[in-house]
Amino acid sequence: MSEDDTKLMAPPSSFTPELQSESPKSAQISYRFMCPGPGRFQCSSTGLVFVMAQKTELVYKAIQWNESVLQPSGKIPAGLLFKIQCPEDAVCQLHLPHCETKDAEFLKSLLSVVHITDDGMSILKPLEITDTHVIVTVSHFSAFGIVRAFEVFYRFFSNPCPVHGQVLLFLRPPNLNSQRQNLHLVVLSRNVPLEEVRRRHQDSVYIPAPLKCLLFEDQHYTVDCPTAFIVQPKKADFDLDFGPNYHPTFEIRLSTSIKVVTIALRDQKNTDVWKHDVDLTGPGPEGNHIFRHGL
């Protein structure tokens, strides 16, 4: 399939995969999709796009990078590493989501895809790089992930471009003795799936909010929340993090009597890059606390 053919194709059909895990509390999940036949299909959970040649079952999961394997080739992770299982020749193209904002010509020299098998690692040249995905031709599967060329990235580091980011909110159960509650902010690149992060914060309640923002790597950010007792840490550097743990970037300590808080993420120039009024109450009458609803 040529690059021109790819551009002329209709948008992919979206599907919601079946989530599988060894136990309800397991942080490791797999995604399963019964593909109905040939076509282009996009996973609503991971952003992956599969160009299918036939009806088949797809099973895939995010696995941990081994950066010591990448370093000799001068590569660093630029997305999650996905282990994909399906019959040979069932998939003809794979589209992996990226978070870059740089122009397409620059991305051609910056991004590539690694294919890791039991026999070793190979570097795949992209067929095309769009505003959202890196596209490669595939025939058989094991593990695939987007990488950056270390030398190219740092050659242009003096004139950095932001990446597409996201801010995820997780509310911890309240401490009834101290009448305090902690709200965690997890600041990540756009191409980290929400479900991967939620599985690492299963004792917290995820609070939906507008996610998108633009972030600069290796620059520090602060959080402003006027109603907070304390925000920890006072500042934090933003780096690309592709798991597996997804620890909180910031912790905001609040009174349990607080129902709504305004939170702003600010850059080094004290400019808001993300801001939201966060509702800490559930949908029931009188705004009962979300933990009392078991949400």
Regions found by a protein language model. Give the residues of each.
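A structural signal for beta-rich interaction modules in eukaryotic proteins
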Residues: M1-L111, H115-L295
